[in-house]
Amino acid sequence: MTKPPISHHFEIEFEVPGSADEVWQAIATPGGISSWMMPTDLEPREGGEVTFHMGPGAASHGHVTAYEPSHRITYEEDWATLVGQPGADVTPLVSEFLIEARSGGSCVVRIVTSAFGTGADWENEFWSEMTLGWAPMLDNLRLYMTHFRGQHATSLFASATCAGSPEAAAASMREALGIEGTTGETCTARDLVCAVERSMDRHFLLRAERPLTGLLSFFSYDAGESTTVQVVGYLFGDNPASYVAEEQQAWCDWLAAATAGTTADAAAT
C-alpha cells in the first residue's frame, strides 16, 4: 500500500437456537446460506470458491480460507471490484464465522469482518452500509433457525425504483400492507398471510405463515437520482419454486404500485 493502512473492522456476537451441527449447516453450506442471507454458490472446503448473488448483475466472488466443520468458516472477497473500484489499494474483505455451543440447545455465533484500506470515502461508505445490513440478516438467521431449521429456501427477488426518500418509500410499502410496523402485527402481503418480525425506517421483515411459509424482507435505499425498493423472499412449503416463477413479476408490479406513481423502472430476475 502506498499509504499507511487504515483498519476496517466489524464484530458482532449473537445467540441462535440449534446445535453446533445445525448452525453449521445454516452458515457454511450453500443451501443453508441461501435460505437466510442470499443465493450462494460454495465449495465446502478450504480453498473452495464462494459466490454471493446479490441481485440482477451483482455478485461477490471469493474463496474459503478456513473450513472447520461445526466450528469455523472464513472466506475472503474482492470488495473493491464489487463496488466498482478494481485495483484499489485495499486488502481482501475477510469474514469469519465462529460457532460456540451453549447448554440448552443453542449456540453463540461470532462474526468478525475486517480489511485494510486507505480511508477513502468509498471505503467508509461501503463499511457503513455493510454494518447496517447485518442487523436484518441476523434476524433472518435467527428466524430461520427458529422456524425453518434444516430446510432449503427458494429465493424471490423483486425491485422497482421511485421518487422520494427511502424512508417515504418504506412508509408507502407499510401503508400498502396496512401495517404500522409493530412486531406481531399481521397482514396479507399480496396472497401471503404474514406477521411483522422487525420494522426500521428503511426496512421491515415479515414472516409468511400461509399458504407458503418463509421470510419477506422489504428494503428501500438511495440510488442517486431515485430510490430503489426491493422485496427479498426466502420461501418454504408446497412448491415455492412454482410460486416464484408465477408471481415474481407481480411482486415487482406491487412494489411499483405501492410507491404510488413514482416508479421509473421495475424488473424481476
Residue positions per predicted region:
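Short acidic N-proximal helix/loop "leader" segments that mark the beginning
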Residues: 1-9
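Ordered, small/hydrophobic-rich secondary-structure cores
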Residues: 9, 13, 19-118
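Short beta-edge strand/loop motif at the mouth of beta-sheet-based domains
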Residues: 18, 30-63, 68, 72, ...
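Short amphipathic alpha-helical segments
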Residues: 19, 25, 126-133, 137, ...
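A structural signal for alpha-helix termini and helix-coil/disorder junctions
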Residues: 29, 39, 140-147, 151, ...
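Conserved short hydrophobic interaction patches
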Residues: 30, 67, 133, 137-144, ...
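Beta-strand/loop substructures that line and gate deep hydrophobic ligand-binding cavities in soluble
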Residues: 82-129, 200-269
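Surface-exposed beta-loop interaction hotspot
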Residues: 115-173
